[in-house]
Amino acid sequence: MIPYGSLVVYVTPNKDRRYIKRLEEGQDWHSNDGVLSAEAVHAANFGSEVRTSLDIPIRVLEATLHDRLKGLKRQTQIIYPKDIAYICLRLGAGPGRTIIEAGCGSGGLTTGLSWFCGPTGRVVSHEAREEFMK
């Protein structure tokens, strides 16, 4: 069962396209391949196929770190995944660690650091410009 509020990736058979969406109760997903019921996705498991109103199979996957980074709105220059991985490696980022960051910008590095620190760690970010914090 996929919890509501989860970030999911819908993979269509039509040119193998990927769509990143947050699963919300009562919020069906509409596409050229038909309507995908939020309740049907909620009842499924990650990795399974759910059929649309047009009987087209859509694969439902859990969003990876890469998917999350691709979905960020970019107000500033973003740090790319290969650079984020190198920075996390050099910092020794991992579960339970606390990392202090100067400037969060578009949030790419902050997202990566949070991913590697996990639920037991934390990222403290100081941003001088208020508009980047929104």
Regions found by a protein language model. Give the residues of each.
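Conserved SAM-binding loop of SAM-dependent methyltransferases across substrates and taxa
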Residues: 106-119
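Glycine-rich helix-loop-beta junction characteristic of Rossmann-like nucleotide cofactor-binding loops
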Residues: 89-94, 115-116
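N-terminal auxiliary segments of SAM/dcSAM-dependent transferases
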Residues: 1-59
